[in-house]
Amino acid sequence: MTANLLDFDLDGLAVFCERLGEKRYRAVQLFRWIHQKGASNFDDMSDLAKSLREKLKVSAQVKAPDLISQHISSDGTIKWLFDVGGGDAVEAVFIPEEDRGTLCISSQAGCAMGCRFCSTGHQGFSRNLKTGEIIAQLWFAEHFLRKHLQRDERVISNVVMMGMGEPLQNYAELVPALRAMLDDHGYGLSRRRVTVSTSGVVPMMDRLARDCPVALAVSLHAPNDLLRDDLVPLNKKYSLAELLNACNRYLAYAPRDFITFEYCMLEDVNDQPEHAQQLVRLVQHYSSGGVWCKFNLIPFNPFPASGLTRSTPERIQAFAKILSDAGIVTTIRKTRGDDIDAACGQLAGEVKDRTRVGERIARQRTFMLKPVSEINTQVKEN
């Protein structure tokens, strides 16, 4: 069976090379060719022995999902749609700024979380992405942008796992992809510049802290369990108390000294002054005295059939002021790419086979009921 080399972190690639009778340093060379130079043709890898190149031609490939479409926003944001087979497609979004280039990556086709304000959740869950399908989004985007912008140096400085899916429900495939992003022979990204966003899969937050502690963002969206049960159904499994305690445990390993809480601003749902005051009390209750979190307020990005409305700018500003006045670092996310449905909460994948939506929703319900022991959490040993 032909192996896709994008599925391996460096250690996995070293094991693969050993099976071919090659030394570890060959894996380093190969890893650099793939991730730093964007090579997919083994004949282009000129410092590899010809004998190794011939072995690779019959046993391996470097294969990213096919690109279906590209959309460029008026603000420079780029959205790519990738075909991952079986009628499924996933999206990645590049957000250019003066001091950074951020890529938003998907981890699943669809999502099992069912958050009310998220278009992906309304699509339902289809399947987990493989490691190669996750890292291929960065591999494609980085080398496409270098060629397009005629630059030799790195274009993407930050990666956020905030695209389609719940990353921590795909733990075994996620971690090797994160390691490839961080590896100096790969993309060499700082742990501070790679962020995993989670709805609050508490046991996997603890695992990530030990295995690959990158920056953490938590989709909070509500100041109490009653409201969060409605907006983020996973809260019925892991309450705010369990989630906030897990956040404090994560801080001991985190590359930053704070956790980011994401809070989608929904008119007349979670945007009242009393909600902000409840958040202040919640944060203070779990604080050990210092600043341990920041809030990122996200204006809701509407999509059909959501039944929700974006809070007014005035209400968002007033909400932010209550948090800031309490000493909580608070930012308001600038909406980017909403004219191409690339803004936060809008990624739905434009799945080619729309006839399977009912099947996906049923699979979503089943997936949500699984105990953690049945979720794919075993990091691959190659």
Curated annotation (Swiss-Prot):
* Name recorded for this polypeptide: Dual-specificity RNA methyltransferase RlmN
Function, as annotated: Specifically methylates position 2 of adenine 2503 in 23S rRNA and position 2 of adenine 37 in tRNAs. m2A2503 modification seems to play a crucial role in the proofreading step occurring at the peptidyl transferase center and thus would serve to optimize ribosomal fidelity.
- Protein EC: 2.1.1.192
Name the gene. Answer: rlmN
Spell out the disulfide connections.
104-344
**Which organism is the protein's source?**
Albidiferax ferrireducens (strain ATCC BAA-621 / DSM 15236 / T118)
The answer to whether the entry has keyword Acetylation is: no
Task: Name the catalytic site residues.
Answer: 91, 344
What's in the keyword line of the UniProt record? 4Fe-4S, Cytoplasm, Disulfide bond, Iron, Iron-sulfur, Metal-binding, Methyltransferase, rRNA processing, S-adenosyl-L-methionine, Transferase, tRNA processing
Localization: Cytoplasm
Needed cofactors, names only, are:
[4Fe-4S] cluster
Q: Where is the Radical SAM core domain?
A: 97-339
| A Pfam short name | RlmN_N
The residues listed in the UniProt record as binding [4Fe-4S] cluster, with positions renumbered to this chain, are: 111, 115, 118
Q: Which sites bind S-adenosyl-L-methionine?
A: 165-166, 197, 219-221, 301
